[in-house]
Amino acid sequence: MAQQSLIYSFVARGTVILVEFTDFKGNFTSIAAQCLQKLPSSNNKFTYNCDGHTFNYLVENGFTYCVVAVDSAGRQIPMAFLERVKEDFNKRYGGGKAATAQANSLNKEFGSKLKEHMQYCMDHPDEISKLAKVKAQVSEVKGVMMENIEKVLDRGEKIELLVDKTENLRSQAQDFRTQGTQMRRKMWFQNMKIKLIVLAIIIALILIIILSICGGFNCGK
């Protein structure tokens, strides 16, 4: 079993914790709740360090997703966990029960899900790392797009030109997403080409051997 690097998690609406889970005891729960009270309400990600632990928060649309992790877990695994929890929580409660739920009222329904997502992220660090790298590359492309747009605005170029350039930059992101598929297809064709060449060489060698044994084309005589 993987090392227990994720130790506590909760989902809150505003400052009201709707569901939480941990297998441990400690003051990390009260520290996480205190940090929640001071978080900005804007959509963002936050990480605080305290006594060998990180307190990681994902704030989106009035809900806050939190996980407390040991320092050695880094940032990729905790943030990947928060993204998974956010998606699962929104699928189950988006626009419904979560909007009016009372404090800790979702523990029975969703507490076990927090545990499952914790265990999955701790058991699959390599997969989490690969996904994080892909997302980072996509974010880098988007970052370049936004940076270029800001430069255009600084130079005072016309809006119609800005629209054209934005479309071109969006196509860069699309090209990146299809790059992996194209590379796999190219490798498959190269593989087949090599196999066909090898097969042709083998057939040619067999024919040469047969002809040399039979004395040319007079085998049947």
Curated annotation (Swiss-Prot):
Family from the record: Belongs to the synaptobrevin family.
Assigned GO CC terms: early endosome membrane; plasma membrane
Protein name: Vesicle-associated membrane protein 722
Subcellular location: Cell membrane; Early endosome membrane
SUPFAM superfamilies: SNARE fusion complex (SSF58038), SNARE-like (SSF64356)
Organism per entry: Arabidopsis thaliana (Mouse-ear cress)
Tissue expression pattern: Highly expressed in stems and roots. Detected in flowers and leaves.
Keyword presence, Transmembrane: yes
Taxonomic superkingdom: Eukaryota
